[in-house]
């Protein structure tokens, strides 16, 4: 396995990591209630997704 021949300076390290940042999550508005939701996910406030209501399935309690 190859090893670095020289130590990477702080300036090179910081300049390389300058563009390494997190993006803001992209949201869409729920057509049912208007709340912001993640795309392709059920709405957390009303529980609907693509015309169906999935709130009961999300809040169900599984027992053994």
Swiss-Prot record:
GO molecular function: structural constituent of ribosome
Regions crossing the membrane: none
Single Gene Ontology BP annotation: translation
Residue ranges, annotated region (Disordered): 1-20
Cross-referenced Pfam families: Ribosomal_L32p
Keywords: Ribonucleoprotein, Ribosomal protein
A GO-annotated cellular component: large ribosomal subunit
Cysteine pairs bridged by disulfides in the record: none
HAMAP family: Ribosomal_bL32
UniProt record similarity statement: Belongs to the bacterial ribosomal protein bL32 family.
Protein name: Large ribosomal subunit protein bL32
Species lineage: Bacteria, Bacillati, Actinomycetota, Actinomycetes, Bifidobacteriales
């Amino acid at each position: 396995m190859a090893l670095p021949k020289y130590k990477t300076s702080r300036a090179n390290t910081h300049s390389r990591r300058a563009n390494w940042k997190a993006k803001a999550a992209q949201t869409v508005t729920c057509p049912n209630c208007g709340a912001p939701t993640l795309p392709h996910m059920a709405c957390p406030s009303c529980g609907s997704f693509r015309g169906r209501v999935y709130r009961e399935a999300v809040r169900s309690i599984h027992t053994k």
